[in-house]
């Protein structure tokens, strides 16, 4: 349960925001998902609570009643050690109303930072984890992990190690994925904690690897090359890591806005494919499969799912109060479902290819420099004796690649069979001996028989 628009200021960690329903309706959702083989994880913001949370309220009341010059005593009020209070102002701190005290609040003064190095706070979060996991939740997305102890990767890894040990101790299948919005070298280190996954920010957002490649700001090779090199970066900290690729999220402009001009629909489609063909557990922000629009202020990035162009249709809602009024660039789900060439049906096709070939998600990437260039990338993905070849043309022109000398597993280029083809236009790929011609913005997946 939370107060403000973005719902990251928790007032009750063991309840559902009434705007979304009740614990009973949540249990129904869990059951319906599990019946369909879908696992459900919840977003857990441990870095901070709401300033309206009873823990903070009690700490604030205690400090307000404390005689001047007297030091706080946690035996009188344990909650005073749940947060970081100080008599001195520091960067990232806010003043406690009506007192000379300050408290850490990295995001804003309505979200005071919790002291996760305090054992009592850890016990609270173990109970909170128990509450949801015992109900049947399958794990958590951990919000803002680099702010647990702002500026100290080492301390943050220690805090995550405690939580990962606890959650995996209950069931090793419980899944933890962390948001650490920083550079790749830094978030790689967080794998040392034993969490399953870190969101792979390097590939995301309007200046990430995928958008740069699709916009022609970076060579196609950089996609394949980075997929290969990041594996070693992450595995050195945890050989059992599971990558968590994503393209956009609720804090980023939507990808349909990254591209302008006559090829923008093709670029929007293929950008989604480059995300969905990465290995690991891929995340897709709702509405990206429609090419929804939304940029600028946060509310615009969190517009309601575009089920129908009829605002009164089932499932449609108004969206956040401060959201701008804007028109969508592409059609609603209702219309796109009927159009075989829509972004929606393209994304469905990519997911089908991914699911039909488990090596895509599970395999190890090798970048094929000899067959890659400015406009085209080539990589292999291998898992337990299965091997496949991914070829992609990220440009607006057809490109030919000569695969002479290439073997995938034990199979020569000419003998590879077609596993999947993803096109954004009318043209299809052609194979003549070892030469493959890829139309604009297309992907070919070849494998062994």
Regions found by a protein language model. Give the residues of each.
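Hydrophobic faces of well-ordered beta-strands that scaffold small-molecule active sites
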Residues: 40-42, 140, 176-178, 245, ...
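C-terminal beta-strand-rich structural cap/linker in extracellular carbohydrate-active enzymes
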Residues: 428-449
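Active-site-proximal helices and loops of the catalytic beta/alpha 8
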Residues: 34, 47-48, 53-74, 128, ...
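Acidic/aromatic-lined carbohydrate-recognition and catalytic surfaces
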Residues: 1-123, 134, 145-193
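Loop/helix patches that line or flank the sugar-binding groove of alpha-linked glycan CAZymes
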Residues: 170, 175, 246-249, 258-400, ...
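Beta-strand-rich binding/interaction modules
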Residues: 398-423
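Short glycine/proline-rich turn/loop motifs
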Residues: 102-117, 249-256, 324-334
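Short, acidic/polar
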Residues: 119-133, 268, 272
């Amino acid at each position: 349960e939370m107060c403000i628009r973005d719902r990251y200021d928790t007032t009750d960690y063991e309840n559902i925001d009434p705007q979304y329903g009740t614990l009973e309706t949540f249990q129904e959702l869990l059951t319906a998902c599990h019946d369909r083989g879908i696992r459900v994880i919840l977003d857990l913001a441990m870095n901070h609570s709401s300033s309206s949370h009873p823990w903070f309220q009690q700490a604030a009341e205690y400090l307000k009643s404390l005689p001047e010059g007297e030091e706080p005593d946690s035996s009188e009020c344990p909650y005073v050690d749940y947060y970081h209070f100080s008599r001195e102002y520091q960067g990232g701190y806010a003043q406690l109303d009506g007192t000379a005290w300050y408290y850490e609040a990295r995001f804003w003064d309505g979200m005071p930072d919790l002291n996760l190095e305090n054992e009592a706070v850890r016990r609270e979060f173990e109970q909170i984890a128990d509450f949801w996991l015992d109900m049947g939740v399958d794990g958590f997305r951990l919000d803002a992990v680099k702010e647990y102890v702002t500026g100290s990767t080492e301390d943050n890894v220690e805090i995550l190690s405690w939580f990962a040990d606890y959650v995996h101790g209950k069931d090793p299948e419980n899944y933890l994925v962390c948001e650490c919005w920083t550079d790749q070298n830094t978030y790689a280190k967080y794998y040392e904690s034993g969490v399953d996954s870190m969101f792979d920010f390097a590939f995301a957002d309007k200046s990430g690897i995928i958008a740069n490649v699709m916009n022609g700001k970076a060579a196609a090779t950089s996609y394949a090359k980075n997929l290969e090199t990041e594996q070693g970066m992450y595995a050195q900290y945890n050989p059992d890591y599971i990558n968590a690729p994503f393209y956009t999220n609720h804090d980023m402009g939507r990808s349909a806005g990254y591209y302008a001009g006559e090829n923008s629909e093709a670029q929007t489609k293929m950008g989604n494919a480059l995300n969905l063909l990465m290995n690991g557990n891929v995340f897709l922000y709702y509405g990206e499969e429609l090419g929804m629009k939304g940029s600028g202020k946060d509310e615009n990035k969190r517009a309601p799912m575009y089920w129908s162009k009829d605002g009164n249709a089932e499932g449609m809602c108004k969206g956040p109060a401060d959201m701008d009024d804007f028109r969508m660039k592409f059609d609603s789900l209702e219309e796109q479902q009927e159009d075989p060439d829509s972004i929606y049906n393209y994304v469905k096709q990519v997911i089908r290819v991914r699911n039909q070939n488990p090596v895509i998600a599970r395999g190890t990437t090798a970048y094929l420099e000899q067959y890659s260039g400015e406009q085209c990338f080539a990589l292999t993905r291998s898992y337990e004796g299965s091997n496949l070849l991914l070829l992609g043309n990220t440009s607006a022109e057809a490109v030919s690649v000569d695969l002479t000398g290439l073997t995938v597993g034990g199979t020569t280029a000419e003998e590879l069979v077609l596993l999947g083809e993803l096109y954004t236009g009318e043209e299809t790929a052609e194979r003549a001996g070892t030469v493959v011609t890829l139309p604009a913005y297309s992907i070919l997946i070849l494998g062994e028989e």
